[in-house]
Amino acid sequence: QFLTEMKTAFSHLYGKEIKKNPDFGRIVNERHMERLQKILEQDAKYLFCGGEADTLQRYIEPAILDLGKDQNAASMQEELFGPILPVLSYHKLEDAVRFVNKRAKPLALYLFTKKRSAEKFVLERVSSGGVCVNDTISHLINPDLPFGGVGASGMGQYHGKYSFDTFTHEKSVFYKPADWNLPVCYPPFTKGKMNLVKFFLK
């Protein structure tokens, strides 16, 4: 049912002939066009709908791939940066969370649900750079909120002061007069010195 609704949504947003819609973009260059076509060829058996390609226009019709439980499909091995949507099936939410957590932490987590309990369950268990519930990309809109990844998805945060802090290195500098030394820092480490150090470390 989800796949059918997605197919209907494509037609609703872009019309029956998506290729003629001026609002639907094209692939950035030939290299990426070839890369995406190769992925579609490798995963052809999973094609639910779409996938029509025009190399001259660098156009690919939005494609939905029904992978079932095949996590090793070509479309699951890299970021796609193209109109290809691989869909994996799961029975329990725990299975989906386990799948995500076995991989590098995502730059963004998009969760679609009407259940607050599902929101809480996922957000408490999945680490990601940012989160959108029932939407995508909108967490980038507010310039006062940080944008960044976790681990492999990126280090540091951006937007406003967060960008300034990311590109600023706070360096500790300690100055001591050249002719001033604390005897307690140097041997011999007598019992008296040890007691003094313990006193200051309490």
Language model features with spans:
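ALDH superfamily catalytic-core signature
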Residues: 1-71, 92-94, 133, 199-202
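Conserved C-terminal structural/oligomerization subdomain of aldehyde/semialdehyde dehydrogenase
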Residues: 11, 59-202
